Amino acid sequence: SISCILGPSGSGKTTLLKLIAGLEKVQSGKIIINGEEVSSTSKHLPTEKRKIGFLFQDYALFPHLTVKENLKFPTNAKNSTSNVDEIIELIKLPNSLDKYPHELSGGEQQRVALARSIISQPNLLLLDEPFSSLDLSLREEVRDDTLHLLQKSNVSVIIVTHDPFEAMFISNHINIFDKSGSIIQSGTPNDLYNNPKNSYVTGFFGETNQFKGVVKGSHIITPVGKIKTPENLEGENVVVHIRPQGIKLNKQPTPVNGIKGTVMASKLMGSFSFIHLSVLDNNNEIVHVHSHMPAEFNPKQSSAVEIEIDNDQTYIFKN
């Protein structure tokens, strides 16, 4: 399994990894790995006896050793040569085995470091922001290679990241931390994205359009339309979150079924168009709204559009 710790900078994600690895001592509580207590206020099993692999942000490859020598360094009499050869084959660097780390690209160094961390067959592998130093195009390639390698290795993994989409791509279970280091919600990527428990979790997976108001008659009136609310929120002050992809637009000179919006800007972002809209609230004051539409949707500035809401991309919480 691949479990992710997702949270903002300063929330204690890396510190937790160090505690699990035995690089720091716990001040309270316990850490249990495979049924064995490895850390408590009265016990501290040394790092080298925990059978844990650790991939650091800077990779920590030995600069004086070749790729092959780096990979073979963690092995001992208990490790079969076939396991080493299998891992070497998986990293797809047949022509680089005799090179030194400084002769490799960032992505190649990352693959070698990952392979070295799993070649000794650890019970648990810890990854600390493993893709943060890579540029966007290389990050996607290396992330895909990493997932493939981890699945092939059949090792349990805990990965730390502040990138929600990276967490969704590579893990099958996510724990969301708040700034204090508390776990706010845990679950599969699908659960957390589609069933967030509060505004914090909702916002962690990207920008949302937010509107506040009071529920009346099982509905709340927003600048982008009337939204049905759960029955248990009647009379409550609530905040409505609508993801940009939940704001659907039609090119209409006048609204037919929805609410009128005016296009302030339309920007092609590659796979989608980012539309910046202005709408009027109940007090005739301008409110700004963001929409993500298919790339071919590119309305002119100042043009009128019709707004409709996708309820599946709408989330309502007590304020």
Where are the language model's segments positioned?
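ABC ATPase NBD coupling module
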Residues: 38-54, 192
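Non-catalytic connector elements of ABC transporters
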Residues: 208, 219-319
